[in-house]
UniProtKB/Swiss-Prot annotation:
Name of a matching Pfam family: LYTB
Cofactor comment text: Binds 1 [4Fe-4S] cluster per subunit.
Residues the record lists as binding isopentenyl diphosphate: H43, H76, H126, S224, S225, N226, S269
Protein name, UniProt field: 4-hydroxy-3-methylbut-2-enyl diphosphate reductase
Gene that encodes the chain: ispH
């Protein structure tokens, strides 16, 4: 069989990531460096490194930022406590929280005010989960996995609703909800799907190429939830092997031994140049035929954060 690449589409940048990265670039143009960013603007080492070279400074907490400095909140969102701390320091805040994450924040606020206890399906410690749960810390409990759904101790069970992190495995989330419903039949669903369109689309594309691939390569960083999920989805849907890497030069040539078909995709925070670099490496290894496998068309564009909206150019 001739060596070939199955290139998943959609892949790479989603609308929220594109918006956040442009926000940092625009802030640097307008205000000049340094511009401070709380946490990584998106979870990709290449993107963060590129922005650092342009003058962005990434910090873990707002108390590391000089008073009055231009500060950007990452795409993953923040809690009200972080907003309060930023205001106390007089920071010039540009909020690059993804609008789809903000939607979940609003759901938390609305349900908690209505007396609901919220089971937030997600990964404890992830910045998005910390920001979301911070909007009602006494009314939110994080459920990390289907197995945890079987045993988690819920203090208030009369009015329950489940919400989720936006970058989870669709299938694993459905399994978690199924198990929660066995214990709490009255648990309410969110008003709309919390897992974002880009996460779902990228997983659907991987499901299409996985059973046809001897190896699936996911370009993405280790701390990128949606990239890690793509590896899991590939393995769960028929790929003989799957790996994640940040850069093409990390690819171990031994992985290509006896491999005829390589599936390629990338996480939602990955610029296309990194995929192109990988395709060049694969071409040199004999994988010159590239077939695009498209499962959806994405044309969503978010407006830039307040204060940066006059131009996206």
């Amino acid at each position: 069989m001739a060596k070939r690449v199955l290139l998943a589409s959609p892949r790479g940048y989603c609308a929220g990531v594109d918006r956040a990265v442009i926000a940092v670039e625009k802030a640097l143009e307008r205000h000049g460096p340094p511009v401070y960013v709380r946490k990584q603007i998106v979870h990709n080492v290449h993107v963060v490194g590129s922005l650092e070279k342009k003058g962005a400074i990434f910090v873990d907490q707002v108390d590391q930022i000089p008073p009055g400095a231009v500060t950007i909140f990452s795409a993953h969102g923040v809690s009200p406590a972080v907003v309060h701390s930023a205001n106390e320091r007089g920071l010039q805040v540009i909020d690059a929280t993804c609008p789809l994450v903000t939607k979940v924040h609003r759901e938390v606020i609305r349900f908690s005010k209505a007396g609901y206890f919220i089971l937030l399906i997600g990964h404890s410690g992830h910045e998005e989960v910390e920001g979301t749960s911070g909007h009602a810390p006494d009314r939110v409990l994080v459920v990390n996995s289907p197995d945890e759904a079987d045993t988690i101790d819920v203090p208030h069970t009369d009015k329950l609703v489940w919400l989720s992190q936006t970058t989870l495995s669709v299938d694993e989330t459905l399994e978690t909800v199924k198990r929660l419903r066995l214990r709490f039949p009255h648990i309410q669903d969110p008003p709309s799907d919390d897992i974002c369109y880009a996460t779902q689309n990228r997983q659907a594309a991987v499901k299409k190429i996985a059973p046809l691939s001897d190896l699936v390569i996911v370009v993405g960083s280790a701390n990128s939830s949606n990239s890690v999920r793509l590896v899991e989805v590939a393995l769960e849907n028929g790929a003989k092997a799957a790996v994640r890497l940040d850069y093409a030069d990390e690819l171990d040539p031994a992985l290509l031994d006896k491999v005829d078909v390589v599936g390629v995709t990338s996480g939602a925070s990955v610029p296309e140049i990194l995929v192109r670099d990988l395709l060049e490496v694969l071409a040199r290894a004999g994988y010159t035929k590239v077939e695009s496998v498209q499962t959806a068309v994405e044309d969503l564009v978010f407006s830039l954060p307040k204060g940066l909206r006059e131009s996206r150019k």
